[in-house]
Regions:
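ATP/Mg2+-dependent ligation/transfer catalytic cores
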Residues: 1-194
Length: 194
């Protein structure tokens, strides 16, 4: 798991956008939307992004005091390196790829979750172990968009699936079932349209 795959790729002539994305230390998906031409020109060398993305809280406000990024009067760049093995067509015309953040000197950003996971997997391998993971989804989702929820002060929101209770309670409406089915397909290696 030491390296990400950067094999050749074909986006197809109908692609108008490539969304690059990765998580920060809070698990928030952050990234950019690029034209296919810009993506092709920068994917192998790294795509510059401000290290500010590691200093944003869940409300998207800059927060100071973290060990990384080390802001001392300026915001530095980090490089996004796409993992081409994660490239999928998200919907017609839009491709999405997950990647990792690296410092411009070539060192992995230690607070990047994928880099951290990679270093842990590599450390386990040196001791003769193989890492395995599992995901348990425990969440309450709401029908309102993030903008609507903020405007309401995160109060009086409508739970997706109705008010049937906990995540284990299966008496939920079809919108919950449809959503969770899509999540399970995606986690199982599928993507929209499969």
């Amino acid at each position: 798991m030491s390296e990400t795959r950067t094999a050749p790729y074909d986006l197809g002539a109908d692609t108008h956008t490539v969304r690059i994305e990765s998580t920060n230390h809070d698990g928030s998906f952050l990234g950019k939307n690029l034209t296919p031409r810009k993506f092709a020109a920068t994917a192998s060398s790294g795509i510059a992004m401000a290290d500010l993305l590691f200093g944003l809280d869940l409300g998207n406000a800059p927060t100071f005091g973290f060990a990384f990024p080390e802001w001392r009067g300026h915001v530095s760049d980090v490089e996004f390196r796409p993992d081409m093995s994660t490239l999928v067509q998200w919907k017609p015309g839009l491709h999405s790829v997950i990647g990792d953040y690296w410092q411009t000197g070539g060192e992995p950003v230690g607070t990047c979750p994928r880099n951290l996971a990679r270093s842990l997997v590599d450390r386990l391998a040196t001791r003769g172990f193989t890492a395995c993971i599992a995901v348990e989804i425990e969440a309450t989702l709401f029908e309102e968009s993030i903008h609507e929820a903020r405007a309401k002060g995160y109060r009086g929101l409508t739970p997706l699936g109705g008010s049937a209770g906990t995540a284990y309670h299966l008496a939920k409406s079809s919108d919950w079932v449809d959503y969770m089915s899509a999540v399970v397909r995606r986690l199982d290696g599928g993507h929209p349209g499969q």
